[in-house]
Amino acid sequence: KYLKQKDIKEIMEKRGNWKEFKPNNKTKKNPDYIHVDQHYSNDKSLWKYKAPLKSLVDLNSDSDSIDNKFNLVENLKKLNNNKLDALLLKQYKINMYDLNKNINKIKDYQSLFHNSKVWIFKFIYSHGGENIIVLDSFDKFKEYVLHCIEVNKNKWENLDYQKYKNIGKTKKGHYFIEWVLQEYVDNPLLYENKKFHLRGYFLYHKTDKGNKGYVLNNHRIFTAKQEYQKNDYLNKLIHDTHFHSASKKIDFKPDISEVIGKVNTTKIEEQINLLFQSILKIIKTPCFPENKYCYHFFASDIIITADYKIKLIEINKSPGLPTENYTNEISDPNFIFQEIVRNIVDKHYTPLNPPTIPEKNYFIEL
């Protein structure tokens, strides 16, 4: 959906070693390489093909090491790295099913809101900014929890909770049981007086020699619509950051880096590299049995504090790329696909005409 057939063909044919696979070819039943974006990741018509290299990994067999909002941070903490821990937000897992059985347990979280501490509360299996709320008092937290229980408790009446633990993430999403209360960054670095976050891209490559990772050396900047203030937390125009909220297309380099200077830019990039090197260590995601090699395209959401420390918000396993009106060079689907082919596909199938590394924006190996 993001890529056009003619653009894919041009990118591959330039290398001099690729031909388009023909499904009716009787002498070659399987392609050597399959790439699908998020819109075709569940296309059953492709399941019959056994390509040595494919752009899908078996996330369901990985015990949620990366795309689960709560487990990702907990797994990173297990690396026992103080520098890494400084990049992670405090968090608590909230089980609505348990609270419904004993609502008095909600008092266990009251102390978290002392000294006007602000938290963001989000459903673990949500995406696209849904089921997320910022809370600045225990009373508001309690009110939201009670509302959520009231709306969903009928689903839980006949639920076999032991079976629930073993069902897939999509089905779990129907029950709204597992939530995470995550520390809210209330001292963000601002751009033109607006809150923003970094949207980055990360490639995970599974080979027979171990895991490899690549991170884009630049980031899109998603801003809030209105200028930042430390209150009115339910006002999404102030506190929600999205690509369509920005009045112009903004990147970390040069837009932010020119404002904060070379020293702070380097400091931030070093933290980003440490974060993704660590993420690469905890991923155990295998290929599907029919593929010898595989890779996956992830997006990351990172916020920078006023003292130039990064904080990981989450990793997105199915990142939607901006539409044509909002895209730019580093989020352009053709650019990303070319970099996937250069960094991963060309390693398996050596091109006759190797491409050059882009001058400014490119993926670097971790």
Predicted regions and their residues:
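A short acidic/small-residue loop/turn micro-motif
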Residues: S318-G320
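Short amphipathic alpha-helical segments embedded in low-complexity Lys/Glu-rich regions
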Residues: N25-H35, Y92-N95, E290-F298, P354-Y362
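Conserved N-proximal alpha/beta basic substrate-recognition cap immediately N-terminal to
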Residues: K1-I120, I124-H127, V134-S137, Y144-L146
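Catalytic-loop signature of eukaryotic-like protein kinases
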Residues: D301
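Catalytic core of tubulin tyrosine ligase-like
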Residues: N115-S116, I124-H296, I304-K311, N316, ...
